[in-house]
C-alpha cells in the first residue's frame, strides 16, 4: 500500500507544471566585483569566485589570513628592523664624512650588493601581467610585443574608474595638467642637475621606451626590453645594415668641418622623422628615428657614433685577423658596458643625491639568485616622463634659443660643434621634476597624453603602487603635496586620495628636502632601473669576462668608462662635462682643456 502511494506521488510530481524562472529584481543592486576593493595586501593576488566572493592567494608573501595581513614570525621581525624609506634616504644624504669612510672600505660593496638585491627583488621575474591579461598567462610571459605590468588593470566592472573610491568620472586630463603641472615660474633642481643629464635621460631611455603607434599603448617596438643600444644601431636588422659601413666593424659617418658626424639620410636611407621641406642631405641618420627633434639628442648620437668607431680601431689593432662582423658585435658589447657603467655610477648617482658612492660591478651578484632577463613595464614608461627637466629656453654661448628655434634645428650641432654644446648643456641647470607646476607649456601635451593613456590602460591608483613597493599609502592629499591649497583642489577633483592616478601622484608628491623629486619616484623607479641594468646579459657570469670584450683592452674600456671619457676621447678639446652644473666658485664661463689620451 505504501509502495503504491509512493508511485502515485511521484507521478503527481512529474505532472506538475515546471516552476517559473524568477528574474532578478531590476532595482536590486548588482554585486560589486570584490577585487575592486583591492582587498589583498602585501602582494597577495585577488581571485574572484562567483559574483561576490574572492580569495587572496598569499603564497610566498610572508603573510597569511583572508587578506594576507597576518605576518609570519620572520616577516614581522624583518619589518620591525627595516627602516622607513624616508629615514633611509635621510641617512644616505647626510653625514658626508661618514660616507667618505664607507666608500673607501669593503662596506661599500656590501651595501651596494644589498641595494641591488633588495631593489631588484621588487620586480617580478619572469613577468606577470600585460594590458590584455590581468592574470598569469603564457602570453604575458612569451609575447615580448607587450609592455609588462607590475599590477593588473582595474577590473572593468568596478563602480568607479579607480575601483570603488573617488568619483564616477575622472577629472579632465587637460584641466589636471594646466592646474597642477603647468609651469608658473621655472623651478631649478636643488641638486644641480643640468641639461646634459636631461638629454642623456631622453637619449638613453628611447632605446627601450618605444610605444607602438600601430599596435596601441600596451605594445612596444623595442623588443630587446633593455640596454641593447637599439637607439644607436637600430631596433631591427634592416635599419642596422643601412647604418653600418661594413668595413672594420664601423658605422657610416660623414666629415663636416673636419669632424665626424652621423651620415645623412641620403647616404644611409633609413626613416627619420623630420619636418617636411628638410632635404635628405640635411637629415642625419641614426638608430632612433626621432632624434632629429632635439640637438641634444643628436649630440649624444654623434658622441656614441664616434665612440663606436674609435673602439673599432682599438680592437682592429688588437685583433688584425678579425672580420667586420666580429669587430662590430664586440664593439657593441663594449658600448653596452660603457653605457651601464655611466648610468649607474654617474647618472643614477646624480639622481639619488646619495653620499654612498654607487658602483657598477656585476660580480657583486654572482653569489646570489638573480635572473639575467628584463621586461620593460608600462608603469616604468609612464614614470619616466620627466619633462619638467626642460627649461624655458636653451642657452648656447651668448645666444638664447626658444623652443621654436631649438626643435628640429638641423644646423646647431655642426655650427657650434660637439664641444660647445657639451659645455653649454653642462652649465645650464635643469628643472625640478617633483612637486608639480614645473612643466613648460610647449611640452605639457605629453603629460596629458600620459594621463589619458593610463586611463585607457586602467592603471591602478597611486596608493596601490605605493603599497606594492613597500611604502605606506597616503591618507590625505595634504600629506601627499604638503600644502593646503593644492590639496583642496585635488580633493575637489578626485574626491578621495585612494582614487588619485599613478602619474599625477608621482609628479605632485612633495619632494625630499633639497631633492629633485619625492619618495615614490625613488622607491618605484630604482627597482625598475637597477633590475634592467644588472639584468643585462653582459652582467651575467657567462658574459662578464675579458674574452667577451675582445680581451683586457676592451674589458678595461668598460670598467673605466666615464661621461668625461666619452666626450673627451672623441673631441679635439675637452669642455666642462658633467651631469651637474659647476659650483658657483668654479663657474668661470666656458673653458676647454686638452683631452686625456688614456683609455
Swiss-Prot record:
Enzyme class: oxidoreductase
Record entry for activity regulation: The cyclooxygenase activity is inhibited by nonsteroidal anti-inflammatory drugs (NSAIDs) including ibuprofen, flurbiprofen, ketoprofen, naproxen, flurbiprofen, anirolac, fenclofenac and diclofenac.
Signal peptide residue numbers: 1-23
Active-site residues per Swiss-Prot or TrEMBL entry: 206, 384
Site (Aspirin-acetylated serine) residue list: 529
Keyword vocabulary terms for this entry: Dioxygenase, Disulfide bond, EGF-like domain, Endoplasmic reticulum, Fatty acid biosynthesis, Fatty acid metabolism, Glycoprotein, Heme, Iron, Lipid biosynthesis, Lipid metabolism, Membrane, Metal-binding, Microsome, Oxidoreductase, Peroxidase, Prostaglandin biosynthesis, Prostaglandin metabolism, Signal
Assigned EC number: 1.14.99.1
Membrane topology: Peripheral membrane protein
Cofactor details (free text): Binds 1 heme b (iron(II)-protoporphyrin IX) group per subunit.
Residue ranges of domain EGF-like in the record: 31-69
SUPFAM superfamilies named among the record's database cross-references: EGF/Laminin, Heme-dependent peroxidases
Gene3D superfamilies (UniProt xref): Haem peroxidase domain superfamily, animal type, Laminin
Protein function: Dual cyclooxygenase and peroxidase that plays an important role in the biosynthesis pathway of prostanoids, a class of C20 oxylipins mainly derived from arachidonate ((5Z,8Z,11Z,14Z)-eicosatetraenoate, AA, C20:4(n-6)), with a particular role in the inflammatory response. The cyclooxygenase activity oxygenates AA to the hydroperoxy endoperoxide prostaglandin G2 (PGG2), and the peroxidase activity reduces PGG2 to the hydroxy endoperoxide prostaglandin H2 (PGH2), the precursor of all 2-series prostaglandins and thromboxanes.
Protein name: Prostaglandin G/H synthase 1
Higher taxonomy: Eukaryota, Metazoa, Chordata, Craniata, Vertebrata
